[in-house]
Amino acid sequence: MSEQERVQECLRKEIRSLLISTKDGLTPQQLEKEYLLMVGNHLPLRILGYRSTMELVLDMPDVVTVSPCGDGTIILRAIPDESTKGIANLVAKQRSSHKVRNSMQKGRPSVCSGSSSRRRVPYRGRVPPILPAVVKSELKDLLALSPVLLSDFEKAFARRFGRSFQYVQYGFLSMFEVLNAASDVISVEQTRAGSLLMLKRSISEEKQRGWPAVTKGGKMFTQPFRMKQQGSYSTGSPVAKACFSQPTSNMEPPKQILNAEKTFKSNVVETSRLNHTEKLNQLENTFKSVISQIGPGGTINPELKHKLRFVVSKFPEGLLISKLLREFEIMFKEQLSPKQLGFLNVTELVGALSDILRVEFREGEQDLLVFDANMKPLASVQSDKKIDVKACVSSPPRNSLSTAAVKETAWDCLPKNHREPEQKICKKPNLVVKPLQLQVGVNKSELNLAMANHDIPPDAVRDKKLCRLPPLDTSTLVGVFVEYIISPSQFYIRIYSRDSSELLEDMMIEMRRCYSNQLVSDRYAMPEYFIQPGHLCCVRISEDKWWYRVIIHRVLGKQEVEVFYPDFGNIGTVQKSSLRFLKWCYTKLPAQAIPCSLAWVRPVEEHWTSRAIIQFQKLCGLKPLVGVVDEYVDGILNIFLCDTSSNEDVYFHHVLRTEGHAIVCRENVPSKGFRELNPLALYTKSSAGPEDVVLTELGCPSQQHYFNEDREISPQSKENELPTLDEIPIGMPCLESVTIGDDVWDENWLPLQAKMGKGGDAPSHLFTSSRGGKKPYLSCKEMPQKDWCFSAPKDMWDDSWQPSSLVNGMKVEVQKQEELSAQEKNIGTTRSQKQPNLESSSDSPTLPKLEEFYISLVESQQSAEGSQFEPSSIQTQVKQMQLSTAALSTTPAAVDSPEKHSGSVESSPESLKNDFSSSHAITVFKDKSHGAMDQLSLILSPEHQISQKLYIPRSTATAALGAAARLATSRRLLHWYPSVKRMEA
């Protein structure tokens, strides 16, 4: 037996002996004193893990029985066992003593009532104190994040507010009393882990009772009450209107309440027929109507409300809600704390004072504006800046209605004058309400009547479409999740990055926190007439308790609808009752699903076999993959997928070809499945611009992106177009990372293979470009005579293909001096022929399009005739150079045969060294839209800061994915060297 068990067993015997010796029992306070007098120590509550005496005795049901007394006190009596039954019988036969035990205060009667010669006022016990509003606000703030176990409450409170929860200073003796005092906002549920504290939700009895409302057909429906006691309400759960809905708009709610009370009191004959339960329900409804009319704003001191109104009235053009507390402090020299009033923040405080204040949101403003409710808005302000309903207070204004007069809110004003197309400004809370866009096939009068009987939240999405993600650049390396698979030619991916997947997770967490509140969920319930194909809403999946954005695809029947998940790509069936309006703030994030097809593959037969689909599903699994963007065909992304989780990288198209499920072709076949049905293109719209969502994770340097097949080439760009090599099929890119800096793995190797283009030339003067615009390059007149243009060779799928330009032991073709001189003359002739075009394009704001990227190296003023091409001297020079110059000097020169019309490179180590000393930067040109080009200036000088980005070369055909490919997730350190794709003129 452990020490704790021994102490507990001994304590059980001592408590039983104390209570058996007392005929009338003891209160918990008396038990503590009796135990202290008998044993000499206090009850060992902390040793046994208890917080109060009541918790201790409740854990001993076989020793102590708890019985409440008529005066409000609690009496503890012993339950005798076999050995103490005789003593209990003897004590029960004793005569009751009316003396006060243990020198209690004189004048206090005994615990139990008995025959007494003197009649005394019965003792009602200690009245539990009221929990202060600031404490209740802190408890709501703590439990709004997540429920907390009672055993972890102190740690959670200290972690949240930086101090322990001292309930004694508020007049409470235990947490049991605190929870009883906060029972209107906190509920306790018993779980296996212990007592779980959570924010109180609507009671099931309140769900069953509702205000009767008459629909068009005369049927009755119920709506759950959204009622809270004064000064206590859950976070983000606005108090709804508690008046009877009426078919006619001219009937006022106060008259209905008074009529209901009059009918309840006067019509005695009809009421007598009702049973007892119905009477209580009717009386309870009357009380709730009065309480809900008062609202949370009724708990605020009228003097404070007058001060707030005085402060706001000083700003007729509106006061920013973030400056309200400061202006109040400046004007009245006192601080205003919303938490002391029972509110979480100033927004919730202002929302509760809708009877004296109104809130507006204007386009272009980042904050809410507060106005005096009695002041008319300025006409100039209304004409210039429109108020938008969608960005109302996060906790919409609560109704602060008196019993004498109840004014209609903006929601009630919505159906009135609906025939007018222009916007109408309502009185409370003075929000501009746009007319509802009628659904096809819905009668306008029926819609108006239905809306009169249903509350549509002002920030609910009605006719908005989600935006799609902006297209990705070719050869972009991304981390992806394959979310939904139909076939290798028809599946959906989701990008794994800081700007996409993490934002989606944050939004889903916020949606779960918001819609899990029963009051909010009931308020945003979608009526039947809004359930139409194409409507954007949200739904909760009962299996995982998460809320998802969905788009209604089609209505299956009276109870079910088919919905499309724009963030994951799948289509599912849900109940109509589970659909909810989507809040406007949850539409900012674009749809995350991207329709894709596996690049360069097609099925062996006409359609994909089931074995091929199963094999593709096994390859994808539930793990992040690396994807390489190839191109877009009919708006469908064709992408290469690779699994880098094992030691050997696995390309999916290779596996499907090896297994005999697919044929690898060097073109992308349009997807038949997406051609028949593409819900994402049907229900979403393209991103309006990069200002909506910019995928900085993908390293897109340009502000605009156009596909090659969709691009139109202007005549000017055609004239400026430089001739390039014949198109060679681009192979799979190498995914080994290369760093430009001190941490290069091989200092004698640079991941750029220089190759002389046929007659091609590029500007050698370096320039920088910003995201906002691009500067024109210099004309060829200002260029040195000896500017060499290097182009990267394009990779091939053939594994036997080897680049002709190799370094560090690789093959280098050396030609005779005569051949070099002759080819050099040819290069000069070609350069002089192309010079007029370059001069004509120098005045254009953008560079001409290039089909390959060029590296310009500024050379020194040395003669080419005196230079000698010596491979041995080059190798010696490579070893002696610093990192910056070594990276440039070791750039291999791809020298092809003269039959291929490729120029050769002639230089010496001295000239190379001088060239690199004169310029330490490389400008990488990438083909962009309408002739515009981006450059990437790589500073290679040692005194400059080392680049922290990883640049991926396209040097070999079948290089495996290395460790750098696993960094393609959310580090922003992985970038492609710009790839080039031939465009049709």
UniProtKB/Swiss-Prot annotation:
Keyword vocabulary terms for this entry: Cytoplasm, Developmental protein, Differentiation, Phosphoprotein, Repeat, Spermatogenesis
Biased composition range(s): Polar residues: 823-845, 904-915
InterPro entries: LOTUS-like, OST-HTH/LOTUS_dom, SNase_OB-fold_sf, TDRD5_LOTUS_2, Tudor, Tudor_domain_containing
Ranges where the Tudor domain occurs: 530-589
PROSITE patterns for this protein: HTH_OST, TUDOR
SUPFAM superfamilies, alphabetized: Tudor/PWWP/MBT
Sequence ranges assigned to domain HTH OST-type in this UniProt record: 7-80, 127-202, 300-374
Compositional bias ranges of the Low complexity kind: 107-116
One GO BP annotation of this record: P granule organization
Entry GO terms, CC: chromatoid body; pi-body
Chain positions with Phosphoserine modification: 897
UniProt cross-references to Pfam families, sorted A to Z: OST-HTH, TUDOR
Major localisation: cytoplasm
Function according to Swiss-Prot or TrEMBL: Required during spermiogenesis to participate in the repression transposable elements and prevent their mobilization, which is essential for the germline integrity. Probably acts via the piRNA metabolic process, which mediates the repression of transposable elements during meiosis by forming complexes composed of piRNAs and Piwi proteins and govern the methylation and subsequent repression of transposons. Required for chromatoid body (CB) assembly.
Family according to the record: Belongs to the TDRD5 family.
Protein name: Tudor domain-containing protein 5
Organism: Canis lupus familiaris (Dog)
Organism phylogeny: Eukaryota, Metazoa, Chordata, Craniata, Vertebrata
